[in-house]
């Protein structure tokens, strides 16, 4: 069974993580920031999968399942917070939340 070389797989994970980080830092829309965070979490999952495949261990796949469940919880809480903020301020701009109290 052919696997992806460790260096190339980790390079792919680093590129995905960098794209997600740029998305979080550059975008001001809360939904795009949340999607960029998801890309970053998936990049970490890819790194776990590649490392697990390199040493023929199922631990990488187990950690990827953990990352997926963490991402699902993060999305549900994040979307709930975005909806609550959108009800108070009818915009998705991250800078608009500076005026909120409480």
Curated annotation (Swiss-Prot):
| Broad enzyme group | translocase
State which residue ranges cross the membrane: 6-26, 30-50, 64-84
Report the domain of life of the source organism.
Answer: Bacteria
**Bilayer topology term:** Multi-pass membrane protein
Which UniProt key words apply to this protein? Cell inner membrane, Cell membrane, Membrane, NAD, Quinone, Translocase, Transmembrane, Transmembrane helix, Transport, Ubiquinone
Where is this chain's protein located in or outside the cell?
A: Cell inner membrane
**GO MF:** NADH:ubiquinone reductase (non-electrogenic) activity; quinone binding
Protein purpose: NDH-1 shuttles electrons from NADH, via FMN and iron-sulfur (Fe-S) centers, to quinones in the respiratory chain. The immediate electron acceptor for the enzyme in this species is believed to be ubiquinone. Couples the redox reaction to proton translocation (for every two electrons transferred, four hydrogen ions are translocated across the cytoplasmic membrane), and thus conserves the redox energy in a proton gradient.
Describe the subunit structure.
NDH-1 is composed of 14 different subunits. Subunits NuoA, H, J, K, L, M, N constitute the membrane sector of the complex.
Its protein name is NADH-quinone oxidoreductase subunit K
Organism lineage: Bacteria, Pseudomonadati, Pseudomonadota, Alphaproteobacteria, Acetobacterales
């Amino acid at each position: 069974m052919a696997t992806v070389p460790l260096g190339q797989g980790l390079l792919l994970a680093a590129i995905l993580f960098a794209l997600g980080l740029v998305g979080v830092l550059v975008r001001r829309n809360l939904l795009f920031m949340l999607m960029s965070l998801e890309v970053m979490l998936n990049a970490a999952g890819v790194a776990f999968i590649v490392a697990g495949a390199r040493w023929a261990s199922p631990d990488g796949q187990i950690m990827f399942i953990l990352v997926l469940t963490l991402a699902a919880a993060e999305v549900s809480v994040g979307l709930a917070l975005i909806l609550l903020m959108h009800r108070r301020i009818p915009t998705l701009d991250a800078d608009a939340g500076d005026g909120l109290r409480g």
